[in-house]
Regions:
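Aromatic-lined, polymer-binding surfaces characteristic
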Residues: 1-160, 171
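Acidic/histidine metal-binding catalytic segments
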Residues: 163
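CBM-like carbohydrate-recognition segments
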Residues: 166-177
Length: 177
């Protein structure tokens, strides 16, 4: 890893934050597979963890990645950066990082974001916070759903099973989205 590749971001700018999020997902999934097949030494794992940790802390600092109530305060026309698929993506990074490096709090955050999304479905099963961005944003609904399903798989392999979650608020499951 280059010491500066995907190592900094301006919190309210998509270009560098998306680069960092996507880099983190690719790196974490790669490390997960290398670890699963015993292709990383303890030293290699420590090196990668050190390189990823400082990048990860930047992602954790994004308002909608820290607190679900920040995400819940997103409304039409209000931009707290990451009210839609971006927040699901950051929760995906947090859950995967937690699974890879035994950060149960981070896996739980991903699960909480998953449950929030299901609780928040509109009557027609739409992720309305995504849809409220305008007609062009509908194409991002698939991205948001993919992030949520990835979180549910991380939850499953971590010993939980949010994919079966039925919202006590909306009555929906992920299958209704």
């Amino acid at each position: 890893l280059s010491n500066d590749f995907a190592s900094d971001m301006r919190v309210y700018e998509n270009d560098d934050s998306l680069l960092m999020k996507n880099f983190m997902l690719a790196a974490l999934y790669s490390i997960e597979q290398l670890q699963a097949h015993s292709h990383l030494s303890i030293e290699d794992s420590a090196f990668f963890r050190g390189e990823l940790e400082r990048r990860y802390q930047k992602i954790r600092s994004i308002p909608a990645s820290k607190e679900l109530d920040e995400f819940a305060s997103c409304t039409v026309g209000k931009n707290i950066f990451g009210c839609q698929n971006h927040s699901y993506g950051y929760a995906h990074v947090r859950a995967l990082y937690g699974h890879s490096f035994e950060g149960h709090e981070d896996v739980e955050f991903g699960e909480a974001m998953f449950r929030f999304a299901i609780d928040d479905l509109s009557e027609d099963g739409a992720l309305w916070r995504e849809a409220s961005r305008g007609a062009w944003s509908w194409k991002y609904t698939a991205i948001a759903l993919g992030q949520l399903l990835s979180i549910s798989e991380i939850s499953r392999v971590s010993g939980s099973n949010v994919v079966e979650y039925r919202s006590p608020i909306s009555g929906y499951t992920i299958h209704d989205a």
